[in-house]
Amino acid sequence: MIPLPTEDPQILFQDDDLIVLFKPSRMYVHPPEDCIARKTVGRHTCIHWLYDTHKILANPIHRLDFSTEGLLLFGKNNPTNSLLNIQMRQHRIQKYYDAVVRGWFKESFGEITLPLESKKSDELLECRTLYSTISKIELPLSVNSKFPTSRYSLLDIELKTGRWHQIRRHMNRVAHPILGDREHGDSHHNRNFRDQLGIDGLCLKAKRLEFYHPHTDQKMVFHAPVSPMWEKIQNLFEPKQT
């Protein structure tokens, strides 16, 4: 059974040409390809929500995974869609993420360039993920008798290419999987975050979106609101006063 979202999306901006939407976790952008999943999800997608709630027909310019919350850009007409898609190809649409990962990186910032397989074949695709450490913590959470504590990092991530599960797969490949990732993560640490800290969900958020308005060339910058889960995460990583 696919869990449905516990909250609705939010329209953060719209005009005659485009929409910036905040997508909650556990919501598809559009109907999934899998027939069984499509029946279960029904009209619980961002595209259907825009039409059912606001009578808006819009086209997503990019995507977010089902489990990832954050900012999405939609075009409302064909000329706008074409211009925004050009910006995507020219890398003028910039997407920034927050992620909680297992462990501490040796360097405070870096770039991951490991090629990743295509979603539908074994073809290796060029991938670029930039990261920098925002904060590090060590918690009294043990996943085995060898280590009484566990280390975690809060990362700022810029996505330079947009492959399937790119951030999630890149972090897993460098041995720093994202917390709450059931497909590419560490089940022991996921369980501790859920049971001990009450953080149950993928700790990945599309937090900032930058692009140029396709008809005025004005730079547009948007920040995602803080959801209840991310409020817990922020509190966890805030420096404790002594």
Name each region found by the language model.
Residues 183, 241-242:
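Flexible, disordered linker segments and immediate boundary regions flanking tandem C2H2 zinc-finger modules
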Residues 1-154, 174, 225-239:
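RNA pseudouridine synthases
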Residues 138, 185, 215:
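Residue-level detector of flexible, active-site-proximal loop/helix-junction positions
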Residues 43-46, 147-209, 230:
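Pseudouridine synthase
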Residues 118-120, 161, 211-216:
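Short acidic, glycine-rich loop/turn motifs
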